[in-house]
Curated annotation (Swiss-Prot):
GO biological process: translation
Similarity remark: Belongs to the bacterial ribosomal protein bL35 family.
Gene that this sequence comes from: rpmI
Pfam family, one: Ribosomal_L35p
Name of the featured protein: Large ribosomal subunit protein bL35
NCBIfam families associated with the record: rpmI_bact
Lineage start: Bacteria, Pseudomonadati, Pseudomonadota, Alphaproteobacteria, Rhodobacterales
PROSITE patterns: RIBOSOMAL_L35
Record GO cellular component, one term: cytosolic large ribosomal subunit
GO molecular function: structural constituent of ribosome
Keywords in alphabetical order: Ribonucleoprotein, Ribosomal protein
Superkingdom: Bacteria
C-alpha cells in the first residue's frame, strides 16, 4: 500500500501539539482592521485551538502528525 500524502495547505496552516490539540492562526485579520476595536485586534493575535470536530478533519489531512 502506498504512503498517504499530507495536504500541503494543511501543514502550512495548522500545527499539532504534543497533546494532540490542533493550533491555528486567528481568522479575520487580512484587511478592514481600521474599523475594528482595539480589543478585537489584541485578541486576534497569536493562535487558537480548533474545536474537536474541526481538529478531527484537519488531522485527517495530516496522517503523520499525530
Amino acid at each position: 500500500m502506498p504512503k498517504m500524502k499530507t495536504k500541503s495547505s494543511a501543514k502550512k496552516r495548522f500545527k499539532v501539539t504534543a497533546t494532540g490539540k490542533v493550533m491555528a492562526g486567528q481568522a479575520g485579520k487580512r484587511h478592514g482592521m481600521i474599523k475594528r476595536h482595539k480589543k478585537f485586534i489584541r485578541d486576534a493575535r497569536g493562535t487558537t485551538t480548533l474545536s474537536a470536530p474541526d481538529a478531527k478533519i484537519v488531522k485527517g489531512f495530516m496522517p503523520y502528525d499525530r
